[in-house]
């Protein structure tokens, strides 16, 4: 039982300190695009860069999706900034 409670606590701590979402351009407010064939490598590099500090990234629905970013990371949609408007 103690092992279960400890595992549950570790999972909850991981959920609190990790953020998932689409990378966003601060200039346009749009998602950072990618292509399905080569996008996974590109997105992984972008997501794990020093700018975003994510754990992993991949191309999903023609946009870069990141997992494990810090809570203060900006992801799509940005407040007060709509894409293309």
From Swiss-Prot:
Its main location: secreted. Disulfide bonds join 30-83, 34-59, 43-64, 47-66. The modification Cysteine amide is found at residue 83. The keyword Hydrolase does not apply. SUPFAM superfamilies: Scorpion toxin-like. One of its GO terms (biological process) is defense response. This is Beta-toxin Ct6. It comes from Centruroides tecomanus (Scorpion).
